Amino acid sequence: MVFGTGVDNVELSRIQKALTRSERFVEQVLTAVELEKYNSFQSTARKTEFLAGRWAAKEAFSKAYGTGFGKALGMHDLEIKNDELGKPFFTKHPFDGQVHLSISHSNLEAVAFVVLEKN
């Protein structure tokens, strides 16, 4: 049974501006594991795309979960990895059930869709 759905999109230029304003922005969004992956990318464009995708995915999760971000849920309560085929999935989350995630990018924005499913 579907518990909740969430979608979020973010312009890559908005993420780039946030990176310019604050050196800590990346650390506020990404966990240590995600930060390691982020730092493995050579190009600024790929780093921005990766960060935007993670931002959108975490925002989409918070909407599907029904709390948004705040005391009940923070960015570091969520962690995303990719499987051997590149499909993103949450490795860390507070939801008791299945979490389905899709992330897509264009040269202008990133979008993510999350479905939370109770067993």
From Swiss-Prot:
This is Holo-[acyl-carrier-protein] synthase. It is found in: Cytoplasm. It comes from the Bacteria. It comes from Lactococcus lactis subsp. lactis (strain IL1403). Transfers the 4'-phosphopantetheine moiety from coenzyme A to a Ser of acyl-carrier-protein. Its cofactor is Mg(2+). Pfam families: ACPS (PF01648). One of its GO terms (biological process) is fatty acid biosynthetic process. Keywords: Cytoplasm, Fatty acid biosynthesis, Fatty acid metabolism, Lipid biosynthesis, Lipid metabolism, Magnesium, Metal-binding, Transferase. Belongs to the P-Pant transferase superfamily. AcpS family. HAMAP family: AcpS. Mg(2+) binds at residues 8, 59. It catalyses: apo-[ACP] + CoA = holo-[ACP] + adenosine 3',5'-bisphosphate + H(+). NCBIfam families: acpS, pantethn_trn. Its EC number is 2.7.8.7.
